[in-house]
A protein has these predicted regions:
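Catalytic phosphate-handling regions of large nucleic-acid enzymes and associated NTPases
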Residues: 2-277
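Gly/Lys-enriched N-terminal cap/neck module of very large, oligomeric protein machines
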Residues: 277-325
Length: 325
């Protein structure tokens, strides 16, 4: 009787899997060995003889020091940032000390000077004409022109230019007109000594600064934010500034303090030659036992915002008011 052939091993037979996986290894060994798998009898790791190990340097994080950065990208970023910062300071936000005007204000005054014939001209016309010097849109030109009109020194307005006391906005540029004041005509312009440079597109010429004989920086005041710095100079009284100029020429002492178009009571004890700050409060008159009249308000505050704050305090029970007119 013939013997039955042996049963063919299946994948479920561990010995069959072991026999299949055995291949000649390095140095004539067949199959995986404890050394090649990195496991020893004691459970400790061991490197295979045919694997080369190298020591890798560990990188330690250090705080970034800009002074030590010298790469090409860093130099490019530094250069571009400085160019942008210088542009914003010179050409947008900060006034020049020589004439006290920001670039947009100077370009508005120069446009009015070139178009001046003594008559009123539409604000929309001046805004469009000024855009050949100022490439930052008509809105910024129109807003700056309205501010100059409300200062009442350099530009005379005709129409609704808003109200600093009530906070009302100006009418549309096509409905209002303006022209230079006589003070601006005589004290700001002198074509013979005005240095001109090409405009932003090279098609026109505009002044570097105006040969102003007035301390406009103190007359108008300014507030601007640039890259890395800001400027805020409070406005001053025009006759007091002229008296101060005369005192300087005569080598006499003088005292100049800020002055605001809306009035108010000012505490200037901390104000010293532009350093420190002033505190301005509303000026109140007691008419009778039950009536208080607010005669003057601080700068930056309008009658509408003041009424709203009084009504809010009344609703919260902080203030008792019978009527508000």
């Amino acid at each position: 009787m013939a013997d039955k052939p042996d049963k063919k091993p299946t994948n479920h037979d561990p010995s069959a899997n072991e026999s299949r996986s055995r291949e000649p290894g390095p140095e004539g060994r067949s199959g995986p060995s404890p050394e090649s798998t990195g496991v020893t009898g004691g459970g400790e790791e061991a490197s295979a003889p045919h694997v080369r190990t190298e020591e890798v340097e560990t990188l330690v994080h250090k705080p970034f020091n800009p002074a030590e950065a010298t790469g090409a990208l860093h130099r490019r970023v530094d250069g571009n940032f400085l160019d942008y910062a210088s542009y914003v300071i010179r050409d947008r936000a900060i006034p020049a000390l020589a004439d006290g005007l920001k670039p947009v204000q100077r370009r508005i005054m120069w446009s009015l000077h070139e178009k001046d014939d003594g008559r009123f001209i539409k604000v929309a016309n001046i805004v469009g004409y000024c855009m050949q010097y100022h490439p930052h849109g008509d809105a910024s030109i129109g807003d700056a022109l309205v501010v100059l009109v409300n200062k009442r020194y350099l530009i005379e307005g005709q129409g609704n230019f808003g109200n600093a006391f009530t906070g009302d906005a100006a009418a549309a540029p096509r409905y209002i007109e303006c022209r230079l004041t006589e003070l601006a005509r005589t004290e700001l312009f002198n074509d013979e000594i005005t240095e001109l440079v090409p405009s932003y597109d090279g098609r026109n010429k505009e002044p570097v600064v105006l040969p102003c004989r007035l301390p406009l920086l103190l007359m108008l005041g300014t507030e601007g934010i640039a890259v890395g710095l800001s400027s805020r100079i409070l406005p001053h009284n025009f006759p007091e500034l002229i008296q101060a100029q005369i005192a300087i020429l005569k080598d006499k002492p003088f005292k100049v303090l800020p002055d605001f178009i809306t009035g108010g009571l000012m505490d200037a004890r901390d104000y010293k030659d532009g350093q420190g700050s002033v505190r301005v409060r509303a000026k109140i008159k007691i008419k009778d036992e039950s009536t208080v009249v607010i005669k003057e308000i601080p700068p930056g505050c309008s009658s509408e915002s003041l009424i709203a704050s009084i009504e809010d305090a009344t609703r919260k029970g902080k203030l008792k008011v019978k009527s508000l007119n």
